[in-house]
A protein has these predicted regions:
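Short glycine-rich, low-complexity segments
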Residues: 1-24, 36, 46-69
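Short aromatic-glycine-enriched beta-strand elements
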Residues: 38-41
Length: 69
């Protein structure tokens, strides 16, 4: 992940995001707590989860259901 992309991820801290992982799996609509250091700290299903940054290949903001477009 490029330095610019890491900065973009850090800007999403405190919001809900979707993460695409290197193994082909996804973590959808998780709360991004922190993207500093070598791990991404998320809150998913009532649990803290720490994902190695090297495993994250893409990310984007989660869409809010019922939000006005």
């Amino acid at each position: 992940m490029t330095a610019e992309r890491r900065r973009e991820l850090r800007r999403l801290e405190g919001s809900s995001v979707n993460l695409a992982l290197a193994d082909g799996s996804r973590l959808d609509d998780v709360s991004l707590i922190s993207a500093h250091g070598l791990r991404v700290w998320i809150f998913d299903g009532g649990e803290d989860v720490f994902v190695p940054l090297t495993k994250v290949i893409d990310f984007w903001p989660a869409e809010r259901v019922g939000s006005a477009a």
